[in-house]
Amino acid sequence: MLQWGRVLVCVLWRKAYTAAPFQGKGNIVRTIGKREVEDMAVGAAVLASGGGGDPYIGKLMALQAIDEYGPFQMISLDELPDDAFVCASHMLGAPTVLVEKVPNGMEGVGAVDALEMRLGRKFDAIMPLEAGGLNSLLPFQVAAAKGVPIVDCDGMGRAFPELRHVTWTLFDIPACPAVVCDEKGDV
């Protein structure tokens, strides 16, 4: 059984890749600071529709990332180059485990690092997989640690129970390759 807070999955959704560092089409859409994170946590609770877990832990992790790395850069899909290499980052499992075991914040970074090493490519941006609950805010910490922007989008528009429930499934875009990483860095 997978325990929330112990396992994080990163999924590659785009097949194309740009060898150069991230270059947007124009200006970064917005800077996300502590006030915006607080507001997003409220919205994440509403969009969770009763699922996805409480966004509180994700909010704390995002606020800590702002203290450590500075405000986040969020770009729109329109800003994202067509050949951008993007990773969706999220946790999976029962969110009640987080009551006893808080993530250390490096699970997502470890998963992204492992996926980049396996693919031989660096990601241009990170995106949330779902808009609801904890997973709305966790990718912000990963993006900040990796020094890349976060994309203003998600896989469905709310929380969902299974990975195959994302919009990309309708277009036969696979949820692989994928990586899992625990709090000890085991991949």
Identify the role of each PLM range.
Residues 10-28:
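Short, Lys/Arg-enriched N-terminal segments with co-localized hydrophobic residues
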Residues 4:
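Cationic, low-complexity basic patches in intrinsically disordered or flexible, solvent-exposed regions
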Residues 30-44, 48, 56-187:
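Non-transmembrane, aqueous-exposed alpha-helical and coiled segments at domain scale
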Residues 53:
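Glycine-enriched loop-and-adjacent helix/strand subsegments that border the catalytic/binding cleft
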